[in-house]
Curated annotation (Swiss-Prot):
Family: Belongs to the NFYB/HAP3 subunit family.
Record's subunit section: Heterotrimeric transcription factor composed of three components, nfyA, nfyB and nfyC. nfyB and nfyC must interact and dimerize for nfyA association and DNA binding.
Organism: Dictyostelium discoideum
SUPFAM superfamilies: Histone-fold
Main localization, broad class: nucleus
Biased composition (Low complexity): 30-43, 181-195, 399-468
Protein name: Nuclear transcription factor Y subunit beta
Region of interest (Disordered), ranges: 1-48, 139-195, 221-264, 325-370, 399-490
UniProt-annotated stretches for the region Subunit association domain (SAD): 80-91
Gene this chain is encoded by: nfyB
Amino acid sequence: MSGNEDFIYDDNSSSSISNQTDGGGGGGSSNNNSGGNANNNNNEGDREQDRYLPIANIIRIMKKALPNNAKVAKDAKETVQDCVSEFISFITSEASDKCQQEKRKTINGEDIIAAMVSLGFENYVEPLKVYLLKYRETEKNSNNKRSPKKSESSSPPESPPLAHLDNSINSGYQPPPPPQQQQQQPPQVQQQQQQQQQQQQQQLQQQQQLQQHQQQQLQPQQQQQHLQQHLQQQQPQQQQQPPQQQQQQLTTTTTTTSTNNQQYQQQPQQQQQQQQQQQQQQQQQQQQQQQQQQQQQQQQQQQQQVQPPYILQQHNIQQPNVFLNQQAQQQQQQQQQQQQPMMNIQSHQQQFPQQHQIQQHLQQQHQHLQQIHNMQPPHQQMQFNQQFQMSQQIQMPQQFSNNNNNNNNNNNNNNNNNNNNNSNNNNNNNNNNNNNNNNPNNNINNNLNNSSNSLHNSGNSLHNSGNSGQIPPLYQQPYISTNPEYPSTS
C-alpha cells in the first residue's frame, strides 16, 4: 500500500489516520492542520513514541498475568513492545486494504476481524466477536445516558466557531468549515432516535424481568395456600367418614411405614452380604495366586535337582531351561548313535541281499555243528581222547600206518592250506579295516566278511579234526553238509 490516504477509525469516533506507510504504524493527526505542519508530522512519525506503544502500559499488562514476586527483564519488555506495535500496524494495513477494495473510508470491527482471519489468527476470532458485541452494547448504554445532556447543551457549542471566525477575520485568514460536521448532523438525529428506541426496549425488558421475579417469589406462597385449602377440605370429609374407613387408612399407613422400615433395615444387610461375598472372592483369588506361586517354585526346584551342581555354579543357577535342553539334545544324539548301526545294517541288507543270505547260512551251519558236539555224552568224549593217545604209542600195521601216514599228510596239507587261507583272510580283513574306517557301509561289509571267514575256518578245523587219527565207531556217523563248499562225510 503506498501514498497518503485518510481513513476513519471505529463506528462512533471522528478521528482519522494520516500518513500511513507500508507495515509501519505511524502516529495519527487531524486533517484540520494546515499544509505547512505536514512535514513536522512526518518527522514526528519517525520517533519511538509514535512508532511504539508506551512501555509502562505494556509492563502493567504483563504484571497482571504474573505473580506478585515476579520480575520482567528489560529485553522481554522491549520485545513485547516491538511485537505489539508491529502487530497493530499489520492488522490496520490489512483492514485498510479491505476498505479500499470495497471503496469505504471507515474501518469497522468486522474489518479488523477479517484481517485477523487473513493473517492466520483464526483461533482468536470468536472471542474477539464476543468482545466486540459487548463493547458496542456498553457504548450504546453510555450514549443513551449522555443523550439528554447533549440535547440540553446543543446550543453552547455553536459559540466557539464564532470566536474562531472573529479571530480569523482579524488575522486575515478564513478557513472553510469542516465537511465532516455537515455530513454528521443527520446521523446524530438518527442515533438519537435509535437510542430512544433502545431505551424503550430496555425498559420493557426490565419490566418483564421484574414480573418474572415477582412470580417466582409468589409461587411458594401460592403453593402453601393450595395445600392449606386442600387440607381444610379433607378435614370435614374425614369427620364424615365412618370409623372403619379411618381404621383402614390407619392400617394402610402403618403397613407402608413398616414396609419402608423393613426396606431400610434390609439395605444394610444386603450391603454387608455383598461385602462378605467380595471378601470371599478376594480370598479365593489370593489362594489361587499362592498355589500358582508354589507350583512354580516346585518346578524350579525340580529343574535345579536335575542339573549337576558344577553346571549350576558355572551359570549362577539362573538358566535351568538351557541345561534341560542340552540334556535332551545329548539323549537324542545317543539315540541317533544307537540307531545308526541298525539303520546302516538295514540299508546294507537292502543293497547287498546275497551277502546277507550267505551270512545267515553260515550261522545255521555253525549252530548245527555245535548241536552235534553237545549231543555226545562226556564219557564217550573221554574214551575218544584215550584211544587217540594210545593210537599214537602203539605200533600200527603197515597198511594202517601207511593209511594213517597218508591221512596225516593229507591233513597236514589241508591244515597248511587252511592256515594259509586263514592268514590271507585275516590280512585282507586287516587291510579292509585300515582302508575303510571312515565309511560305515564298508565297515559292515568287512564285519560280514570276517564273520564268514571265521565260520569257514571253524568248519575247516572241524573237518581236519574228523580226518586225523582213528575215529571210534560211535563217532563214525555221516555228516551231511548243506553248503557245497563243505563236502559231506560218508
